[in-house]
């Protein structure tokens, strides 16, 4: 029998319009369900359901809302963060931690796959990630305006390939982001490559430390066991090795023009974001470089 709290949480976090609007019913066979059901308890689902989607909050606020002790809510939020169901950051005036209930992609699906022990134990999480990187776009892509409206990833050209005679915006340069987040760099295993490996698919890419986390997301990854800190020089070595292997640099595109949380180094045969641009022609128009001519 399906667990109703997991059904409710899957519906809350999904980007699939028919399910979000209640036009179709979420079932045990849907990825939103089986991806969460294997790792989220009913008590954890209660806390997540008390949170607003993509709106930072604190254990104190949720505890008051639920009528529960702060220590109880704090532990559950930390456990969900370790599992990858929640994110947290320190983007507050006083640098205190705030928690976020994310959407699945980009968000919880990647983070759940970055918990290597968890996804090895529950390989259905890999399939859940693959499906959630595809299914929502089958309905929403035709409605996406030029620029992407925050959906997906943004391709960054190899810096030396930008002609010196062109005026290019600073965000088109990897160096801009490394400088902006100097001292706040981390690296973790690629969730796409890991998911494809576990599904027995992809292009045989090695599972390696290729996803560079920046800002307080780097701290989140380190504190929850999903990555480690790196220096500016090590980041440059990872980027150089990626270019030598023909990988594509991509940055996150969900938080506005001058804020990112990751620099990914993607292989066409394993990256779900690059796959999307091949499957959905409309998607290409908002993945192109913003280099000014």
Functional labels for PLM-detected ranges:
Residues 38, 68, 99-101, 252-258, ...:
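Ferredoxin-like iron-sulfur electron-transfer modules
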Residues 123-230, 252-256:
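Long, Pro/Ser/Thr-rich low-complexity/intrinsically disordered regulatory tracts in eukaryotic proteins
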Residues 66-82:
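Short amphipathic alpha-helical interaction segments
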Residues 94-135:
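Short, amphipathic alpha-helical interaction segments positioned at domain boundaries
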Residues 81-92:
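A short, conserved structural fragment
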Residues 39-45:
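Short helix-coil-helix linker/hinge
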Residues 1-33:
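Long, low-complexity, charged/polar intrinsically disordered regions in eukaryotic proteins
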Residues 54-66:
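Short acidic, hydrophobic short linear motifs in intrinsically disordered regions
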């Amino acid at each position: 029998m399906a667990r109703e709290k997991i059904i409710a949480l899957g519906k809350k976090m999904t980007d699939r319009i028919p399910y979000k609007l209640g036009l179709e019913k979420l079932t045990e066979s849907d990825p939103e369900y089986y991806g969460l059901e294997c790792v989220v308890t009913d008590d954890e689902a209660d806390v997540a359901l008390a949170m607003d989607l993509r709106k930072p909050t604190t254990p104190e606020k949720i505890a008051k809302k639920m009528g529960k002790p702060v220590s109880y809510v704090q532990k559950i939020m930390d456990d969900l963060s370790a599992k990858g169901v929640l994110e947290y950051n320190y983007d507050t005036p006083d640098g205190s931690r705030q928690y976020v209930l994310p959407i699945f992609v980009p968000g919880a699906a990647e983070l759940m796959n970055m918990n290597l022990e968890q996804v090895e134990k529950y390989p259905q999480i890999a399939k859940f990630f693959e499906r959630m990187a595809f299914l929502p776009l089958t309905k929403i892509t035709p409605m996406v305006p030029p620029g992407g409206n925050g959906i997906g990833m943004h391709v960054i050209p190899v810096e030396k390939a930008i002609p010196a005679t062109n005026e290019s915006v600073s965000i088109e340069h990897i160096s801009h982001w490394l400088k902006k987040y100097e001292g706040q760099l981390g690296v973790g295993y690629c969730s796409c490559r890991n998911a494809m490996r576990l599904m027995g698919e992809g292009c045989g890419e090695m599972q390696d430390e290729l996803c560079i986390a920046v800002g307080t997301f780097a701290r989140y990854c380190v504190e929850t066991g999903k990555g480690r800190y790196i220096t500016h020089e090590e980041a440059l070595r990872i980027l150089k090795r990626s270019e030598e292997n023909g990988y594509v640099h991509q940055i996150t595109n969900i938080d506005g023009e001058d804020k990112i949380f990751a620099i990914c180094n993607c292989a066409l045969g394993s990256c779900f974001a690059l796959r999307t641009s091949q499957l959905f022609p409309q998607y290409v128009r908002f993945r192109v470089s913003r280099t000014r001519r």
